[in-house]
Regions:
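Cysteine-cluster motifs in flexible loop/terminal segments that predominantly coordinate metals
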Residues: 33, 82-138
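Glycine-rich beta-strand-centered segment in the early N-terminal region that forms part
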Residues: 15-30, 43-94, 99, 141-143
Length: 357
């Protein structure tokens, strides 16, 4: 449990009694991303204390009869738990935009809910995770390793941000800014959608290992922007600029101006990486959007359709997600993994970090 920023402690909770409408998950694995470290460091505010973890895969331990029908799963089934909850009745939920559920909103999500709200088990850094009646639960394909299955979240993001929101079409030239796990997943999603050429950019030694593996995940070109001009590199490779640019960088203010420069006239720029409150965009001129007639879109969260597609793609084996540079640890080593992923330790950050309770 994260009691306060940078204070991750072990805490015992009583397992809840399960009724007709809810369930209990025995956690098999929980993936980590940049959001986890932002919570840990306090950069992303929240209602401390809480159990982090929002990329959970596990086995249904207990389930109510109504919940089993609603989710289509039973005791012993392996499932993935979506980040957001849905009341299934407000206008936003009925339109499929349950990220904006009137009952739950954006903050009332797994891995963010204060532990003072019973039963406290609202995240994947635990042996068990509570499944509320409004949870969104997805069956995991048989034979898919639970550690690999935690990629349902970043790959779902790659599909939604890099294809659905962007409107990526066969033959498109796609530039992905940021070679972290979501960047790799966006590259794979774009290639899977038929993109004709995919470039992925990174920055300096920290991203070196990530850039070395991007070609296994659909990228045709990897560019270290500390060494090479990505606009020049893309022009040399394709004869032009990108139809679609997907910016999944985090805390990289200059990336937005670079994204605008990489987009062709009338192209699309999808911004999914957050910059933090008050961040500027060095080198960016709004006039560039006007003169190039760009379509600039924000992307937040993932939906069930993208999650299901992600699980199917993971199960297909078409991309070597099982071979990603990965570090898997128990609950007692979670803090060290968080520090490593943020570049705050002597160990190089893994592309994919996972906790297995």
């Amino acid at each position: 449990m994260l009691e306060t920023p940078r204070k991750l402690v072990a805490r015992t909770f009583a397992l809840p009694e399960i009724g007709d409408d809810d369930g209990l998950l025995r956690v098999a694995a929980c993936g980590l991303c940049g959001t986890d470290h932002e919570q840990f460091s306090g950069d992303l505010g929240g209602g401390f204390a809480f159990v982090p973890g929002h990329e959970t895969v596990g086995i249904v331990d207990t389930i109510g009869s109504k919940a089993a029908v609603r989710w289509g799963v039973n005791v012993g089934d392996r499932v993935a738990v979506e980040v957001f909850q849905s009341c299934r009745s407000c206008p936003a939920c009925l339109e499929g935009e349950y990220r904006r559920c009137e009952r739950h909103g954006l903050a009332d999500t797994y891995g963010f809910i204060p532990a003072e709200r019973a039963p406290g088990l609202w995240g994947g850094y635990a042996q068990y995770q509570y499944l509320s009646p409004d949870s969104m639960v997805l069956p995991v394909p048989a034979g898919l390793d639970p550690v690999v299955a935690t990629l349902f979240n970043p790959l779902g993001a790659g599909i939604r941000w890099g294809v659905t929101v962007a409107g990526t079409r066969p033959g498109d030239v796609v530039a992905v800014l940021g070679p972290g796990i979501r960047g790799l997943c966006a590259a794979a999603a774009a290639k899977e959608a038929g993109a004709g050429y995919v470039m992925v950019t990174g920055l300096g030694p920290r991203d070196a290992e990530r850039l070395r593996v991007v070609d296994d995940f659909g990228a045709d070109l990897a560019v270290d922007v500390a060494v090479s001009d990505p606009v020049k590199a893309l022009r040399q490779a394709t004869g032009g600029l990108a139809d679609v640019v997907v910016d999944v960088t985090a805390k990289a203010p200059a990336a937005f101006a670079q994204a605008i420069s990489l987009a062709r006239p009338a192209g699309t720029v999808v911004v999914a990486g957050t910059r933090g409150g008050g961040a500027s965009a060095p080198g960016f001129s709004p006039d560039a959007i006007v003169f190039k007639e760009l379509r600039v879109l924000g992307a937040l969260g993932v939906d069930t359709t993208a999650y299901r597609s992600a699980l199917d793609l993971l199960a297909s084996g078409r991309y070597p997600f099982e071979d990603l540079p990965r570090r898997t640890v128990g609950l007692d080593a979670a803090e060290g993994l968080l520090l490593s992923m943020a570049g705050e330790s002597q160990e190089p950050p893994p592309v994919h970090g996972v906790i297995t309770p």
